[in-house]
Design a protein with these regions (language model features):
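G-domain G4 guanine-recognition motif of GTPases
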Residues: 77, 132, 161-164, 186-193
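Inter-motif core of Ras-like GTPase G domains
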Residues: 143-162
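Active-site/ligand-binding-proximal alpha/beta "capping" segment
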Residues: 149, 169, 173-183
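Conserved small/polar residues in nucleotide/adenosyl-binding loops
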Residues: 202-208
Length: 208
């Protein structure tokens, strides 16, 4: 390791710090807060099917509610998978956060716009829009999420990727970024894989 071990610090604690510092450097070296300015601030989720967007949407809502005193509204814009709406509803109930959906609508752009109107009317200062999973090669689906972005002008667009995707995540992230110009990457399921192929897009771009 080549590190001087301080006598007042346990070797195990020093190891944790070394790993933390290395991971911080790998992920870009700086901590950047999510932009939650606005009435409401809007965060748009994007990513492949099964990447963990819905679960992360709930976790993000809970974190911003408890640590930033935000009043979030979760929005179900996956009009293709009814189970996704139910999953988001259950998560919303568990964290005591309201959820907006339109069961009979097949227009995610309209749903997202109506949700923002609902947030303004009821005083919610944060809207988290959960969208359907999609492949970058599916032109129709990519046009759809681009239309959602254009309609709601989100503060942040997050690309959610399963860390078990491996190096394929690099190409997928680049393809999504070309269409959406996203602001950040969320790595999910980090406890389930050791390959570490999906890494910070900031790191990837710096080493192209």
């Amino acid at each position: 390791l080549g590190q001087n071990v301080l006598t007042a610090v346990k070797p195990s604690q020093l190891m944790v710090k070394i790993v933390h510092d290395e991971l911080t450097q790998l992920m870009g070296g700086e901590t950047v807060e999510i932009d939650t300015k606005g009435q409401p601030a809007v965060i748009l989720m994007s990513g492949l099917q099964g990447s963990g967007k819905t679960t992360f949407s709930g976790k993000l809502a809970r974190m911003l509610k408890t640590k930033k005193n935000k009043r979030p509204l979760l929005v179900a814009c996956d009009v293709y998978r009814p189970a996704a709406i139910e999953q988001l509803r259950v998560l919303a109930e568990q964290i005591d956060v309201p959820m907006y959906s339109e069961i009979d609508s097949k227009d995610p752009v309209s749903i997202a716009q109506n949700a923002i109107k609902e947030a303004r009317a009821k005083g919610y200062d944060l809207v988290i829009v959960d969208t359907a999973g999609r492949l970058a090669v599916d032109e129709q689906m990519m046009n759809e999420i681009a239309a959602i972005k254009e309609a709601i002008q989100p503060n942040e667009i997050l690309f959610v990727v399963d860390s078990m995707t491996g190096q394929d995540a690099v190409n997928t992230a680049k393809e999504f970024n070309e269409r959406l110009d996203f602001d950040g990457v969320v790595l999910t399921k980090l406890d389930g894989d050791t390959r570490g192929g999906a890494v910070s897009y900031t790191h990837l771009r710096a080493h192209e």
